[in-house]
């Protein structure tokens, strides 16, 4: 009897296990069940304790089946509950994408492989980052090498590798170039001396020079002597005309600039008057000798007393005119020397600020000096100098620019020195001298013995000189 009972229990256990296994297999291969189970998170959490225990053992189906068999041997109801939990846990395993794989070991390998692959990917990304860092460092080294080799000279120019030496060479060379370039242009002017044949062209050049002097004074020197914020300060002074020391101070500064311009005019007038008094009736009629040589011979050969008196009067008048023009030439050279001195200060300070700034300043000063030097050349020719001698005297004024450049390069604060010179009495005083030379000494020469067509050319030349200075003032 008990043997039959044991056999019956064994058959019941086998049937229960087979039913559970069949249920497991069916549920695992049923897509609808899997989909329902994946979305039913609440039911899974109800068996969370048991399910997590199965997750801890690696999610192996055989381990779960063994546990189900042991539970079935204890009680039928618990076996059913566990089977249901097992099925749910298996559904959880299906979330990993391995619901159809009954080999949990292979799943672990795949999971490990995935992890290793992710790690390898991260490592690859890290390597890529390292490569990017290396690429950036390489670019930095190339840029540094390019900057370092920008001023690398070899051979005869190797001395320019020293920054201080290079600064001096650039500054002095730029100053010499500015002084020599106008002389190169003067070589092509078809005037050799002050003769009657070259008179019309010389007057046109004098008109051009006077326009350059006036434009330089009113459009360059005087504006540079006035502070940059002058317009704003002026309106502010008018707005507070009853109140303040600030407006009074600005008005005093305006008066000082105009006062120095007047001082320059009066100083040049005084010097010319003193030279005339000291030299008296003496005159160096070098130019007169060229233009009136025939009249001299005629005076010596003629025995008529009236003719001698007329010729002597004409000669004295010409000598006085030449004497006046000579004094004007000297005064113009003095003013040009002072002007070139301030240009030299600006060139030195600009090269200290940088090579590019220095080159731009050099070009600006060069364009500014060309019409100015042509006018000086015409005044020197008019005063009796030959073309060669006038060009050599023009080079003497370059000493002013050289001295200004040297002082600027030696100064501890070249920018402050250049700004101080620009805002001091030097520029307005020089402007007054240029105004005096143009209006008192040069323009009166244009009023004598000119035809209508010659007058048109002279006025056009005068306006051209002013317009060139205007263009330079705009783009400076």
Swiss-Prot record:
Native species: Caenorhabditis briggsae
Q: What is this protein called?
A: Zinc transporter zipt-7.2
The Swiss-Prot or TrEMBL record describes its family as follows: Belongs to the ZIP transporter (TC 2.A.5) family. KE4/Catsup subfamily.
Q: What keywords would UniProt list here?
A: Glycoprotein, Ion transport, Membrane, Transmembrane, Transmembrane helix, Transport, Zinc, Zinc transport
Q: What does this protein do?
A: Zinc transporter.
Entry annotated with the keyword NAD:
no
For molecular function, the Gene Ontology terms on record are: zinc ion transmembrane transporter activity
Q: What is its main location?
A: membrane
The listed locations are: Membrane
Asked whether the keyword Ion transport is assigned, the reply is yes
What is the residue range of the signal peptide feature?
Answer: none
Q: Which residues are glycosylated?
A: 194, 340, 449
Task: Give membrane topology per the record.
Answer: Multi-pass membrane protein
Which regions span the lipid bilayer? 2-22, 171-191, 204-224, 255-275, 347-367, 390-410, 424-444, 455-475
Instruction: Name the segments for region: Disordered.
Output: 71-146, 229-250, 281-319
Q: Give the matching Pfam families.
A: Zip
**Gene Ontology cellular component annotations, sorted alphabetically:** membrane
Q: Which GO terms describe its biological process?
A: intracellular zinc ion homeostasis; zinc ion transmembrane transport
Compositionally biased spans, kind Basic and acidic residues: 78-98, 106-119, 127-141, 292-319
């Amino acid at each position: 009897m008990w043997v039959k009972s044991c056999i019956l229990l064994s058959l019941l256990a086998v049937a229960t296990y087979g039913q559970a296994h069949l249920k497991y297999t069916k549920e695992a291969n049923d897509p609808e069940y899997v989909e329902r189970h994946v979305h039913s998170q609440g039911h899974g959490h109800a068996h969370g304790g048991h399910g997590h225990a199965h997750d801890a053992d690696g999610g192996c189906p055989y381990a779960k089946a063994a546990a189900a068999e042991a539970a079935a041997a204890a009680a039928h109801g618990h076996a059913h509950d566990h089977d249901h939990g097992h099925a749910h846990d298996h559904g959880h395993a299906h979330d990993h994408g391995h619901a159809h794989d009954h080999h949990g070991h292979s799943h672990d390998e795949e999971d490990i492989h995935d992890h290793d692959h992710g790690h390898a990917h991260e490592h690859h990304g890290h390597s890529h980052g390292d490569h990017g860092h290396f690429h950036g460092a390489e670019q930095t080294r190339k840029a540094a090498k390019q900057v370092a080799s920008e001023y690398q000279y070899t051979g005869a120019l190797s001395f320019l590798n020293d920054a201080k030496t290079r600064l001096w060479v650039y500054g002095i060379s730029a100053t010499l170039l500015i002084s020599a370039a106008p002389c190169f242009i003067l070589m092509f002017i078809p005037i050799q001396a002050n003769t009657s044949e070259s008179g019309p062209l010389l007057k046109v050049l004098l008109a051009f020079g006077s326009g350059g002097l006036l434009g330089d004074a009113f459009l360059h020197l005087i504006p540079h002597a006035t502070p940059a914020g002058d317009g704003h300060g002026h309106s502010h002074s008018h707005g507070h005309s009853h109140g303040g020391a600030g407006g009074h101070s600005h008005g005093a500064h305006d008066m000082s600039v105009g006062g120095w311009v007047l001082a320059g005019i009066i100083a040049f007038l005084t010097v010319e008057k003193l030279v005339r008094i000291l030299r008296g009736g003496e005159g160096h009629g070098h130019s007169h000798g060229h233009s009136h040589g025939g009249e001299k011979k005629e005076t010596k050969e003629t025995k008529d007393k009236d003719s001698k008196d007329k010729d002597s009067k004409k000669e004295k008048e010409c000598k006085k005119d030449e004497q006046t023009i000579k004094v004007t030439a000297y005064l113009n050279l003095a003013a040009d020397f002072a002007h070139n001195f301030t240009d030299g200060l600006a060139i030195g300070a600009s090269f200290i600020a940088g090579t590019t700034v220095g080159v731009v300043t050099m070009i600006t000063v060069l364009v500014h000096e060309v019409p100015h030097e042509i006018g000086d050349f015409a005044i020197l020719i008019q005063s009796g100098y030959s073309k060669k001698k006038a060009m050599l005297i023009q080079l003497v004024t370059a000493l002013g620019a050289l001295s200004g450049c040297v002082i600027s390069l030696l100064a501890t604060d070249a920018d402050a020195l250049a700004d101080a010179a620009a805002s001091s009495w030097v520029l307005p005083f020089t402007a007054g001298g240029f105004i005096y030379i143009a209006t008192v000494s040069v323009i009166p020469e244009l009023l004598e013995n000119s035809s209508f067509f010659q007058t048109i050319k002279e006025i056009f030349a005068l306006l051209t000189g002013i317009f060139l200075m205007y263009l330079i003032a705009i783009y400076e």
